[in-house]
Design a protein with these regions (language model features):
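Flexible, glycine-rich linker and terminal segments associated
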Residues: 25-70, 108-111, 116-120, 126-171, ...
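Outer-membrane beta-barrel domain signature
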Residues: 195-201, 209-211, 252-258, 268, ...
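Solvent-exposed loop/turn segments connecting transmembrane beta-strands
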Residues: 196-204, 216, 230-233, 257-263, ...
């Protein structure tokens, strides 16, 4: 995916484009579309068959992963790890297709019911996001069989499921060895628009972005993005006249002189310090304008509708034209965050702390997420910067690609309008903050979209 930031008359729009090519190291280039198919019916098991002698096979975990992947990979899912016991089995899996999580859970549950031996009466499904186990949803096998065609099966399946925090590393869990280390890449076009206030000119730059990522271990990755202009008219930009440090207002200079540009080049380590505590450490060229070190901790129990977070960054502003160079400006930023999830897809977030220009303040945002993947929200920032732009407001909309293409996809078009070109109240533009990774897999949002479980 490529992100395009559009700046016109002080308003910034961000668009995530789904056009691109991707592949793995040594693999073929692929533009193969996916088409949604009806789910496979659940095969009823014999509850009297409690023989667990199948566990005596030394290769049983490997064999089970093989057959699960045979069923799941056509669905856009992938086995990350598997834990087998005589009466229960835990599947840790990646969801690469469905933007509504319960639909992925439903497909994974059907696969377990049709592959696991009859003695396994309990299934635990644990989605994995960038190496993080984000929640565990436990089903009784008989419930899946009884509720599949029940007229009230959606409600009953949710009420009887148990949503909890995953055990960080349960004994006996076996990972798929082919997943780590793993190299992946993507290539796609994007467009940037810039408005130069001093010359009152509207400018554009059509560019290509190449992304690469090496997943070394679960949660540990090295990644980077390089951009190159294809054509455009972004030129002769003049420095901003803002009295604050130009952390955002000189963005036109980054576009003009950054050709080619190493947009990001960083290492990320995501891990869980406890079942409900998520941690992120990032270092390198974190975004186009800043590089340094970033750390984040999130406390968010899977069955709870609120959470708390803390983020601290020590960064230095990058040079305009020097690919790896820096300017002299350094700053420490940090935020305490509170997250609230209400009924009907409504959520709120409050961030209080220090911004990139050295100003202090708070940001509040409210979003409404719909069961079809759409979302819309508003945000506002107020800081103590003694400038006219000390208040920033805007709104954002997410349009899922599957709404346009009518096929399942996690790709989305994200458009945000607001005064984000101002220096006051500006945060780092990080692409891997923790709450955005775990939110959709926790109880509140699962409940709001559970109607897709049997789809």
């Amino acid at each position: 995916m490529a992100k395009t930031r559009v700046l016109l008359a002080g308003l910034t729009a961000t668009l995530t484009l789904g056009l691109g090519a991707n592949g793995s190291f040594g693999g073929p280039l692929s533009f193969t579309p996916s088409y949604e198919q009806a789910p496979t019916p659940i095969i009823r098991h014999n509850p009297r068959d409690t023989d667990a002698s199948w566990l005596n096979d030394a290769n049983v975990n490997q064999t089970a992963r093989k057959y699960l992947n045979k069923v799941l990979r056509p669905e856009g899912l992938r086995v990350e790890a598997l834990l087998l016991k005589p009466r229960s089995a835990e599947l840790r899996f990646r969801n690469g297709r469905y933007n509504v999580t319960p639909q992925a859970l439903g497909r994974a549950a059907r696969a377990m019911a049709n592959v696991m031996p009859a003695s396994v009466s309990q299934f635990v499904l644990t989605p994995i996001v960038d190496g993080l186990p984000v929640s565990s949803i436990t089903f009784q096998r008989t419930d899946l069989e009884n509720f599949e065609n029940h007229p009230n099966g959606t409600k009953l399946s949710f009420e009887n499921a148990v949503i909890s925090d995953p055990v960080t590393m349960p004994q006996g869990l076996q990972y798929d060895p082919s997943l780590y280390p793993k190299f992946s890449w993507s290539l796609g076009p994007y467009v940037e628009f810039n408005h130069d206030d001093l010359t009152s000119s509207n400018q554009y730059s059509v560019r290509a972005r190449a992304n690469a990522k090496w997943n070394v271990l679960p949660g540990l990755s090295l990644s980077g993005a390089i951009t190159k202009e294809l054509f455009g008219n972004v030129s002769t930009n003049t420095p901003s006249t803002s009295t604050l440090q130009h952390v955002r207002s000189d963005r036109g200079l980054y576009i003009e002189r950054g050709d080619p540009s190493v947009e990001t080049l960083k290492a990320d380590y995501l891990f869980k310090a406890a079942p409900s505590i998520y941690t992120r450490i990032s270092a390198g060229y974190l975004e186009r304008s800043f590089g340094g070190v970033s750390g984040e901790v999130l406390w968010k129990p899977a069955a709870q509708n609120w959470g708390l977070g803390l983020e601290v960054n020590r960064v230095k502003q990058r040079a305009f034209g020097n690919v790896f160079g820096f300017q002299s400006y350094e700053v420490t930023t940090g935020y305490a965050s509170a997250y609230f999830e209400f009924k009907d897809g409504i959520s709120a977030q409050l961030d209080v702390g220090r911004y990139l220009a050295g100003d202090n303040g708070a940001t509040i945002s409210i979003d409404k997420r719909f069961s079809n993947g759409w979302s819309a929200g508003v945000f506002a920032t107020k800081s103590d910067a003694n400038v006219a732009e000390d208040t920033k407001t805007g709104f954002r909309v997410t349009i899922p690609l599957n709404w346009v293409m009518k096929t399942p996809s996690r790709t989305s078009y994200d458009v945000a309008f607001g005064s984000t070109g101002a220096d006051a109240g500006s945060r780092l533009r990080l692409n891997n903050r923790l709450y955005d990774k775990v939110r959709e897999y926790h109880r509140t949002e699962l409940y709001d979209s559970w109607a897709r479980f049997w789809r």
